[in-house]
Each structure stands twice: as C-alpha cells, then as structure tokens.
Amino acid sequence: MRSGLLSNKAKIDPWAFIRVKDERSTLLASLNSILPVIHKGVIAYNDCTDGSDEIIERFCRDNPGFKPFKYPYSVEPAGSIKYETRELKEENTLAGYYNAVLQKIPKNVWIIKIDVDQIYFPKILEHSFYLPRTINDVVSYSRLNMIRDSNNDLKVVGYVRPGDHWLVFNKDLYFVNVCGRDEKGNFYSYEQIKLKRKEPSFKPECSSIHFPFEKNIESLWGLQNL
C-alpha cells in the first residue's frame, strides 16, 4: 500500500466490530447474515441476562475467526443525563466500552460496525468492500427501519442513513463521549468515532433491515410514537 492508495481491484476483508446486550431475538440471525462475506471480528458483550452471551460464545466456537469479549463493566446507555453531570467513570461510558473493544482488533486493518438488531444483505456489503480507494475513505451505510404492529405484522417506518454504521481503516481511531442539548432543549448523549475525514466517501444503498424495538416487545405496539 503506497501513500494510502488501494488497488482499483482490491477487495477489503474487514474485521467486524460488534457490541451486544440482551439482543437474543435478533442476535443469531444477524450474525448468520454477515457470514457469507465477513469471516472475522470481535463480539463484545456486557451485562447480558437473556442468554445472548451463550449464543455469542457458541457462535465463536463454530466460527473461530470471531472472538468473544466479555466487557467487565456496566455501561450507561445513550441518552443518560449522567454524561452531562460527569459522574461516570470512563469504563462505564459508551466511549470507554467502544475503545476497549477497539483494542481487541488489530491496527491498520479495515473494520465494519455491525449492530445485531439488523439483518444484513451480504451482496450489498460485499459490493461496499470494493468501494474505498484510500485508507482515509469512509463508507456510510443506510438501513430500512421496521417494526411490528399490534397484529404482529411488519411495517416499514423509515429509510435512514444515521452515520453510526461505517466501514473505516483502523489507524489512529478512538471514540469520545458527546453530550449536549439540541435547539429545542432536548438532551442527547452518545459515543462518537473520531475520523480524519469528516464526510463519508461512499454511501451504498440499503445494507440491512433494522428492528430497533425487538429488545422490548412492549414498545412494538404503537407506530404513532415514531
């Protein structure tokens, strides 16, 4: 690789960057959906109470390119006001967790963030692995949000590209905690990856179907709340 340039025909072979907490309902289906095109990665988990940890350990035994990582701390979720009051230890923050997972992946390799409440289209993922031309390029993925209504029928509720699902080169990467208030005064807090390039280089079309409320089945009743 000279001056960060990639061969025009180079296909990236990324490591999966995965974090899990109580996502049994979609976990195995999500992991199986990436297997045709992603063969290695780190699957981190913490505070699992629904058996997700057992699924992960078994999946990694069956697919030895994937490594399990039990994060030994509780993590405050996105949106918590505790990020503003700064009463959290670093290891209990999202950025602390993400940085710990990142340390388990080799440097100077490509990584793709995988969320296990999504079912992926492997052919679209594979196409995206040919897109980057330099190690500074960033691929940003979009997804189709779906929800179950009170009749247990699936409904499409949005097509989004939120910027939190990416393919990047693991050089000088790290995460920070971000918090503040929007124009309406609503509080927000989340983790943010720090990249050299501010805008995505490539934006392939829908790479996955996202089931954002499968963790909490009670929240599936009520499309009007979206």
Enumerate the predicted regions with their spans:
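N-proximal low-complexity "stem/linker" segments adjacent to membrane-targeting elements
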Residues: 1-32
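Short, acidic, metal-binding catalytic loop of nucleotide-sugar glycosyltransferases
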Residues: 30-44, 48, 58-59
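Conserved catalytic core of nucleotide-sugar-dependent glycosyltransferases
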Residues: 102-103, 122-197
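A short acidic, amphipathic alpha-helical/loop segment
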Residues: 29-33, 55, 126-128
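Active-site-proximal specificity loops/subdomain of glycosyltransferases
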Residues: 2-11, 51-110
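C-terminal catalytic/acceptor-binding lobe
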Residues: 9, 181-226
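Short beta-strand-to-loop acidic/aromatic patch adjacent to the donor-nucleotide binding site
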Residues: 108-119
